[in-house]
């Protein structure tokens, strides 16, 4: 709550769609009014093997309230970096950010380089001694109408600019006539499948072009279309249903009048966890279409 009026960072953790649903009223109001300090909602995406709740995704909640959604590659340096990026993205766009951590991401081991602690610009004690209020932040008409326009005219473009300039999404591999777009959290599974096919090594060096979406919402049309240049086929690896990312990327291609053939659900199953075998079967099926000579 302090992040709304003050340059104070705040974070909270929820378990998947259950915790987000319980807090949905407060979260929707937070997303409407916007924030001054960085606000980060860390969500344990409880989907697939090991889950203890209904099989739903966080993605549609982020879309309906315009929370920017981070889905970092499952290694400790990437996850730690995503926390820093999430706070900075929130502050740059005055919008709360969701950081999604999948079940398997929570079981990785490794190491990461730490940073020195930094004193906050404003402490909670200092904020309490000089309380602020802004009636325009109240989520009631007519202010709520202004909030909606601010989202699409100011906050969204600011978020896209930050994501693009900071390079939050990543591209790996050489140029080629086909490529793969993958949610950041599914990157390890994809690399393992390519490794089993002899198209990647254990360090992640890939012979296939890969566009990694460490930010799955919002998607950047220009960045995606640049990745598609010179390609005939592109595969979207999107776990869970419905296929929000695939649909949006298809819209980008349609509006650009691109001839790139987009693959996704159909080659991959519509629902369920993308286990090692499912990932291998899906990538193999795509390569039979996009690169039969391989």
Model-derived regions, located:
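Thiamine diphosphate
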Residues: 1-91, 102
